[in-house]
Amino acid sequence: DGNLDFTLDVEDDDEIGQLCQNFEEMRIRLKESTEEKIQYDKESKELISNISHDLKTPITAIKGYAEGLMEGVASSPEKRDKYIRTIYNKANDMDRLINELTFYSKIDTNKIPYTFSKINVANYFRDCVEEVGLELEARGIELGYFNFVDEDVMVIADAEQMKRVINNIIGNSLKYMDKKNGIINIRILDVGDFVQVEIEDNGKGIGQKELPYIFDRFYRTDSSRNSSKGGSGIGLSIVKKIIEDHGGKIWATSKLGIGTEIHFVLRKTAGDAQQ
């Protein structure tokens, strides 16, 4: 009947005993495999449910504001501009969510398409900040950028996937921003053989009990489970996977009511690292 919740007690060391030992080891492997599949199926269903919920929210907003534009509710240029900005922001939310789902499927099959190359740290992050700055400005979020590395420092990285890291971290900050005057600061630091990137927000923050788990797949904080913010629960796990595949390390610090700071490090190229 498929029941694997039993134990084969092995008492003798003869052929029968060895056979029983082999069966017991096989039973354990089968039980572990079955439990992993059950957990995977549960997580997949949760992911589909989360994403379905998260897609409905921006779609409803886009439809509502589009109808307002068509019906002339936005009677002034300022109001029309506000409606258009909202539609643009919600479309970005949907795009980010769909990209997360697509990338998650690649993680699940270990088929992440990395293209590593030498990247100039100062130039790369300056360009990233300019790109995300447009969306943050549209959302009324103040963006600060502080680069403390020399102009010629290089790292080996996949430019596209590192951009995904930045976008996912900032997207998470936006999702849980609860301040009227939202602030996101990006700092690039020189720490010996490594470049350290810090992305700090002044959002609602994360409790100390939840903090160690925020990079786990499908994990969502209690506050996100109990709010309309939702979340697929895979955004930061994707970030962790990419950073670790780059040979780096990632961690977070946070205080409830004050904000969260995500830190990650990338090793400099051999010529830039301290000898």
Segments (PLM) and residue ranges:
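Membrane-proximal HAMP signal-relay module
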Residues: 1-49, 63-71, 85, 217, ...
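Conserved catalytic submotifs in the C-terminal HATPase_c
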Residues: 9-11, 115-119, 137, 142-153
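A conserved beta-strand-to-alpha-helix junction within the catalytic ATP-binding
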Residues: 13, 115-133
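Conserved micro-motifs of the catalytic ATP-binding
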Residues: 109-114, 154-157
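Short helix-loop "hinge" at the ATP-lid/N-box region of the Bergerat-fold HATPase_c
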Residues: 173-174
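Short beta-strand/loop element within the Bergerat-fold HATPase_c
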Residues: 183-193
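Acidic ATP/Mg2+-coordinating residue in the GHKL
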Residues: 201
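Short conserved segment of the HATPase_c
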Residues: 206-220
